[in-house]
Design a protein with these regions (language model features):
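Intrinsic disorder/low-complexity segments
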Residues: 3-4, 17-18, 434
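Noncatalytic, solvent-exposed loop/strand surfaces
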Residues: 23-445
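Bacterial N-terminal signal peptides
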Residues: 8-21
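N-terminal secretory signal peptides that target proteins for export/translocation
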Residues: 1-9
Length: 445
């Protein structure tokens, strides 16, 4: 671990604080990949329902290198990661698209897949620091005001090389005390928690589960959820999907609380996981099997609860890459081919759905629910804006399942650039990161 606390950095930090004071946590910040509550739901109003390169573009900046991470937004700062001149890097912009700082770190480890890069993992912030993670194993804490390095470490140098067949996809998550990274791969797999301020290792929990070949590999991001004392849960709980299992851990020490297996009953050796779990009230929702299944797990219990806590399973619907969004007891699922369904979290039954026009481009970005609408973005940079169903009767939908109403399309957005990052919605603005650009979309000032 390297501490960046030189006098020069200290002077820079003092100057930066004078110009930039972190704001308290607000619902209209977007601190991590899946938003303030890690559920794909954004706050705010006044978002546009259509855009193009010549319509509703507040600004667009060309990035100096490639990346696939989703921006983190806090107050006036927008942070993205990318590669710059062979280095892992991060850039901080203000809300007007002006570059405020850029920070180069260690040597970049290039991506293998045409959709991916060595900078796939999304940054996470608390408004004071921003933590960035890369395929190279580099994990760093930066000052969000000026990009000054607070500390750095490298997981692969500490714990062993990456054995994933493809490019790192998991993003770091924050608990009250730690920044946590999940490493799930063929061979040694683990969760590691580092002190947010100093970078010291707080705990490391092995996560070695019986899964064949590529099925042992996961690109998903854990979910941090407030524990329910009535269910015997700790104050903070970590939910992790990968290696044919969902596991829940005490975020204070990494110890496993419960596990559910059986997600790969036939032992398929290529069932790697990409989409992440999401928590819907009393249920953990786990998309799996390369987009073929969704499993709902009741929270609570101890040990192996596979036989007792699976609430329902859908084998006719799933999401391979996009992670579902959750709101008001409903789950919004977007498949890689643009089939979108809204499910009742308690029963798994479809309440309303739509199948977007077929296209050779897939959906990798995850859906976002905001201001009475849903935004889904295709890899060619085309987004569909749908009306979020505000009034649905689950029983009526079940009784008339062959005559379900479709989700209404409100508008389309186009940027004509490769897009796998998830849209970020903050304070009436949509920040869309493509492979080599950052767009800000909204009504003109």
């Amino acid at each position: 671990m390297v501490l960046g606390r030189s006098c020069a950095w200290a002077m820079l930090a003092v100057c930066a604080v004078a110009a930039f004071s972190p704001q308290p946590a607000r619902a209209d910040n977007w601190p991590s990949w899946r938003g303030p509550a890690l559920d794909g739901v954004a706050a705010g109003q006044g978002y546009v329902s259509s855009w193009s390169p010549t319509e509703h573009v507040r600004w667009r900046v060309k990035l100096p290198g490639l990346g696939a991470s989703t921006p983190a937004v806090w107050g006036d700062r927008v942070v993205v990661t990318c590669a710059i001149d062979g280095k892992d890097a991060a850039i901080g912009f203000d809300r007007n698209g002006k570059e405020v700082w850029r920070r180069e770190l260690g040597e970049v480890k290039p991506g293998k897949h045409k959709k991916a890069t060595g900078c796939n993992s999304s940054p996470v912030t608390d408004g004071q620091h921003v933590w960035v993670y890369y395929k190279s194993g580099e994990l760093a804490a930066l000052n969000i005001a000026d990009g000054a390095v607070v500390w750095t470490t490298n997981l692969q140098q500490q714990f062993g090389e990456d054995t994933l067949w493809w490019d790192l996809g998991t993003s770091p998550v924050l608990t009250s005390k730690a920044v946590i990274v999940a490493v799930m791969q063929t061979g040694p797999s683990y969760l590691a928690a580092f002190d947010r301020t100093t970078g010291s290792l707080l705990w490391k929990q092995d996560r070695m589960l019986d899964a064949p070949e590529e099925a042992a590999q996961s690109y998903s991001t854990p979910v941090v959820v407030a524990g329910n004392a009535d269910k015997g849960e700790p104050t903070e709980m970590l939910v992790v999907l990968g290696a044919d299992h969902v596991t829940a851990h005490d975020a204070a020490n990494g110890k496993e609380i419960w596990r559910v297996g059986g997600l790969n009953p036939t032992g398929h050796k290529y069932f790697r996981s990409i989409a992440s779990p999401v928590v819907a009230g009393d249920f953990v929702i786990a998309p799996y099997a390369r987009g073929e299944t969704i499993t709902a797990i009741r929270r609570g219990g101890k040990g192996d609860v596979t036989a007792s806590h699976i609430a329902w399973v859908r084998t006719d619907l799933g999401a391979d890459v996009p992670t579902p969004a959750v709101r008001d007891g409903r789950i919004l699922v977007c498949t890689d081919k643009g089939k979108i369904e809204c499910l009742d979290a308690a029963t798994g039954k479809t309440l309303v759905k739509i199948e977007l026009p077929k296209n050779r481009n897939a959906y990798s970005a995850s859906p976002v629910i905001v201001d009475g609408r849903v935004i889904v973005t295709r890899e060619d940079g085309e987004s569909s804006v749908l009306a979020w169903p505000t009034q649905l009767n689950p029983q009526a939908a079940a009784d008339h399942k062959d005559d379900l109403k479709e989700l209404k399309v409100l508008g389309q957005g186009v940027v004509d650039e490769m897009t796998v990052a998830t849209p970020v919605c903050v304070d009436g603005l949509i920040f869309l990161r493509t492979h080599d650009s950052l767009w800000c979309l909204g009504e003109k000032e």
